[in-house]
Amino acid sequence: FRVGGFAGRVIERMGGVPQNIPGGEIYQALEKGTIDAAEWIGPYDDQKLGFNKVAPVYHYPGWWEGGPQLDFFINDKAFNALSAENKVIVECAAAFAHTEMQAMYDARNPTALKQLVGAKTKVLPFPQDVLDLAFKESMALYEEISTKNPNWKKVYDDYAAFRRDQNLWFRFTEMRFDQFMQSKKL
């Protein structure tokens, strides 16, 4: 399974064998059977690269990445050396790039998904037991790292508290609205 980072560590805990293969080599690895599956970006990019021609089953949701998060990294010393005006310019440019990229994928992924289905790609949900095991092993990994790395623990504890609050809020807003809209024929 081509996946890297934390997701690869979770796959390993689940009994899989993660492979860290560069994006440009995924198609060939799937075609040759070097790997059985690959995590990449989403329908738009997956279809553009033709992955469905060599891996005709498309599983969702991507439990390793509930949604995209585009990051911008800058050296702290370099950023702090900027004028107040230039700091705002960098912050605004980063925010704009994130919003623009998110909007682009939100616009292109539905069409690409339809085209994948039209090309006879089987789009299937991960079985619930797989999602549950991935969640369990993810949480165990985060706790394991927390016991070994105080910096991680500090950041993770803050993140986990924020996530709990967000999950509560989303149950009343986003999730209920999404469920409602998905139940309607548009």
PLM features: residue spans?
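N-terminal secretory/targeting leader peptides
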Residues: 1-186
